[in-house]
Amino acid sequence: MRLNGKTAVVTGGASGIGKATAEMLAEAGAHVLIGDLDETNGAAVAAAIRAKGQAADFSRLDVADLASVAAFKSAADALNLKVDIVANVAGWGKIQAFMENTPEFWRKVMDVNLLGPVAVTHAFLPGMIERNSGKVVTVSSDAGRVGSLGETVYSGAKGGAIAFTKSLAREVARYNINVNCVCPGPTDTPLLAAVPEKHREAFVKATPMRRLAKPSEIADAILFFASDRASFVTGQTISVSGGLTLAG
């Protein structure tokens, strides 16, 4: 699956699934613009990609801040990048009982996991419409399909991202723009590493394949949706979860 001549935005590209996605899209031939709050690691990922003779840039991005999203879009314009692919990978969550949540917690979860993809997509979609072509791939979660204990608001946000994907796909299909969603199961990322060991063990036990996903396995699905191999696929959600949601 080649992306030669394409330009891709990858949010959350400094680590985990986002990093794997940026590396994979660049390897496939795309010019990648990485956005992340972590400027040190984000710039390092872009530099490592360039060191392999591939094209990558980095610009700071807080998907939960509309001003930051606007500045990120301006950075893309300053680089004269005509974005063909938006990969909404940035996410945040914390296992916590719903009755222990605060309104501030709700807002952060919703702003990063739902409104972040909405804002970034809204910023780059006009160019895709103008060129009558584009791909939007949003990383949701199987929590958004079947729920997850201790992740009630997170599950709601991720479920919203799935619904956003389906509705937007209907709206922009006339412009030859594909909009799809990838739902990872528990994945070996820095975010999951912060989860207590007992919860990680429970995730593995609940997964028929009895292991965590590798970030590259999620990136594989993102690459498919971003490529011409998925030219007639839109509004779809695929779980990459080792069978965790067989009935989902």
Regions found by a protein language model. Name each.
Residues 99, 146-152, 174-175, 210, ...:
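Active-site loop immediately N-terminal to the catalytic Tyr-X3-Lys motif
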Residues 121, 157, 165:
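Active-site helix of classical SDR
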Residues 97-98, 102-107, 192, 203:
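Substrate-binding pocket helix/loop in short-chain dehydrogenase/reductase
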